[in-house]
Amino acid sequence: MELIEQVSVAKKANIYFEGKVASRSVFFNDGSKQTLGVVLPGEYEFSTSQGEIMQVTSGSFEVLLPDSTTWQTFSEGSQFELVANASFKIRNSAIAEYCCSYL
């Protein structure tokens, strides 16, 4: 199991899509932040306010990246990058988890 050390974690979860997507914010001593999330099966559309790197930590997602017409599969251990102020879609048929780093 990979650990994140020397951090503060928000007690309250960020809940989206009627509880089907949930994440917790993790704050580092240097001021940076990540979110760790779990996504129940479904299809969801998200928007970014800043650049992000999404790492799949469990399961897999199909992702429709901004300005793309083709869904791409990202499995455990893979990642994709998103620019600020963009929308993207994810879908999954089983529970999946992610770690989001902000650029």
Curated annotation (Swiss-Prot):
It comes from the Bacteria. Its EC number is 2.4.2.1, 2.4.2.2. One of its GO terms (cellular component) is cytosol. SUPFAM superfamilies: RmlC-like cupins. Keywords: Glycosyltransferase, Transferase. It catalyses: a purine D-ribonucleoside + phosphate = a purine nucleobase + alpha-D-ribose 1-phosphate; adenosine + phosphate = alpha-D-ribose 1-phosphate + adenine; cytidine + phosphate = cytosine + alpha-D-ribose 1-phosphate; guanosine + phosphate = alpha-D-ribose 1-phosphate + guanine. GO terms for molecular function: guanosine phosphorylase activity; purine-nucleoside phosphorylase activity; thymidine phosphorylase activity; uridine phosphorylase activity. This is Pyrimidine/purine nucleoside phosphorylase. The lineage of its organism: Bacteria, Pseudomonadati, Pseudomonadota, Gammaproteobacteria, Alteromonadales. The gene is ppnP.
